[in-house]
Amino acid sequence: MIFNTRRTFHHRFLRLVLLAATAAMATDHVAAQAPTPLPAEVEALLARAKVPRGAVAAIVVDASPGGRVQATPLLSYQAANFVNPASVMKLVTTYAGLELLGPAYTWNTPVYIDGPIKDGVLQGNLIIQGKGDPKLVMERLWLLLRRVQALGIRSISGDILLDRSAFAASTQNPGDFDGEPYRPYNVAPDALLLNYKSVVMTFVPNPGSGQASIAFEPPLANVQMQASVPMATNPAGTPLGECGDWRALLKPEFADPFRIGFSGSYPVACGEKVWSIAYADPASYSERAVLGLWQEIGGKLGGRVREGRAPASLKPVFEAASPTLTEVIRDINKYSNNVMAQQLFMTLSMSPIATARLGAAATAPASLEASREVVRNWWRQRFGDADLPVLDNGSGLSRNERVTPRGLARMLQTAYVSGTMPELMGSLPIIGIDGTLKNSRSRVSQGWAHLKTGTLRDSTAMAGYVHSANGRRLVVVAIVNHLNAPAARPALEALVDWAVKEGGK
């Protein structure tokens, strides 16, 4: 819902304060309880994964018993421990976003011109001002530039200025987290984030020519992109008729920002494949993408594409609106999009709508530290100081972020009885159906749980809502922190299966 009046917000805030007070009492009760034994099937799968039970922290509790936060869980195992939730941290960011911004919130990208238009020529500069839109993908950038042309502009005598000043400049090196700089999940937030700073390559075999053609999206100006690659029937080390590790067989060469190429071959058995990579020079990506697309649609530019600020005296000729926050959090949670989560996280300190609801002022430019403080203040106002999350970038792509399963369960219970419950639950993967849980092997809980997943090299996690056949709904939070954590995913799915069965009793 959107809160249009001060009175509506105060009523809503009072209700949440009461929920927080109830939750605080629940916390004390849960903390005093002895740990509940883990189900036998979960224990067996943990042993198979060589993960000790001490590496597990979990809680299963009713989502809304009588519309109140429940004090007595069905299962509580080390639920007060602070653990790394991996991408399950996105639940905190997206629920905070729904509460502070509202489900219908949109990001606007203003476009300015600073000169007259004569005979199809803009005699001045075009300015595109980024305001943190998490989903300014190529299709929407194309529409934005077509709107520029609809103003009668076919040529620009000056420059195209890209204003990225709404966010503090990132000092993040794409390879810092795990040494994988070309993985799109490592892209840093940007006020003018275009197409996730990624290049999408589509490989299409043409057996007649012995080549696989390569289509690149977007067209990056002044970057050579290899048009085709030789095909191989049986690459070395690959069984006949199998695709194998086709990415490695291509022998990619991504380090040069002026060239994307391959020195290997493409297996015939692979058919058509798509590969997305993060561009080697993220600082120049936006300039290259805008120029490449402007030229592709027939636009001419007398100057160049460069960074610059929109003059304060100018008014935009139009603003390009993003999809709603409801749509954005579906991408964040169902597909665990890290950079979109970080864009939302940064927005929370930049938006006057969000900060005003906490009695604070917006920060310019937005920064990670300012956003951490916004989310901490939001948590304190909703839930008190208990189980206060340790925040980094809000996406879970971090070695430092921490939550307690107990605190996360309380948040999910509160969300369940809130006006934004449909939007939050609808953003979560449905086990065995879609998103990051589409390929779940669970047969008991398939279609019966909405869960956010998280995986790092030493953490695996699930959290969300489980539904039983008799209509009972449970909150499940389960997190494993261990070097073998990824192998413990079946154990977490077994806990979800157990919750489905227990909920039906």
Where are these regions (language model features)?
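Small-residue-rich helix-loop
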Residues: V69-S76, Y335, F345-K505
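N-terminal signal peptide c-region/cleavage motif recognized by signal peptidases
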Residues: A21, A26-T27
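A short glycine/serine-rich beta->alpha loop
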Residues: Y77-V83, S276-I277, S395-S398
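Conserved serine DD-peptidase/penicillin-binding transpeptidase domain
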Residues: Q33-A49, E99-A386, A494, K501-K505
